[in-house]
Design a protein with these regions (language model features):
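Short alpha-helical elements
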Residues: 1-258
């Protein structure tokens, strides 16, 4: 286990202790932090059902309720912001990439729409901005039938750390609009949004390979492939947990990797 991963786990522990201080009176909690964190991460990685968990000294329902309590308080997102700030101090990205991916929807209620690429089935659209190392800087969920042109502005406004001035922003033809180019200039970014008349070729996708690589990493967390959670906030918190695991295991802190 790397020092960066221990640091991320410690950040999550500090955030949980700040929001949910230990009980002074009454019985001690049966579920320890390490056991709860490891069980939640196992579910996100493998995609197993919660009832398949076999935690010690408690039931799987306790782990499930703990995850929902942490996610409702934004524990994983806050810890990821702290880790991303440490990462941003060490390196300055030269460019960013934006793209989205469809997530199949089973029980979700909000952020649900018809997926035009999957016979109109219900889906959510997960959008993200990554840097030149493939590290995500924000996530945004929208209904599956939302146009990409409407997603650039909320993503830029929700970036967890301020973007590097004069950096480039790469995007495909779906984001081509005068409004999106103006938004990039507002945040000090040089837009590299491909125009609709651009012919696809190797050069047009040279820099955008990092966003495709991130989604390949994202798909390795089996729980994130299909959305079973009713609220989109719980799904996004699990996404931030996976992103924190990805960032901590990368060799970018100078302390090695898992």
């Amino acid at each position: 286990m790397s020092n960066a991963w221990k640091m991320y786990k410690r950040l999550v522990a500090i955030e949980t202790m700040r929001i949910f201080p230990p009980n002074v009176r009454g019985r001690p909690r049966k579920l320890k932090f390490d056991d709860a964190f490891d069980c939640i991460l196992d579910v996100v990685r493998t995609g197993m059902q919660w009832r398949r968990l076999r935690p010690e000294h408690c039931s799987y329902i306790t782990v499930f309720k703990t995850m929902h309590k942490w996610a409702s308080a934004g524990v994983f997102r806050t810890a990821y912001i702290r880790l991303l700030e440490l990462y941003s101090r060490r390196r300055r990205p030269k460019y960013y990439c934006i793209d989205s991916s469809y997530v199949k929807n089973v029980y979700g209620r909000d952020c649900t729409g018809r997926n035009p690429t999957d016979r109109g089935r219900r889906a959510s659209k997960l959008s993200t901005i990554v840097d030149d190392m493939g590290i995500p800087h924000t996530f945004h969920a929208a209904p599956g039938n939302t146009s990409d042109q409407r997603l650039l502005e909320p993503l830029l406004s929700q970036m967890l750390v301020p973007p590097v001035p004069a950096a480039e922003m790469f995007a495909d033809k779906g984001y081509d609009s005068a409004r999106n180019r103006a938004h990039c200039r507002e945040y000090g970014l040089r837009d590299r949004i491909f125009k609709r008349r651009t012919i696809n070729g190797p050069r047009t996708h040279a820099k955008r390979g990092v966003i495709e690589r991130f989604f390949s990493w994202h798909d390795k967390y089996r729980r994130l492939l299909v959305r079973y959670e009713q609220g989109i906030g719980i799904y996004l918190e699990m996404t931030y947990l996976a992103a924190g695991n990805l960032l901590a295991n990368r060799e970018i802190f100078g302390v090695g990797s898992v």
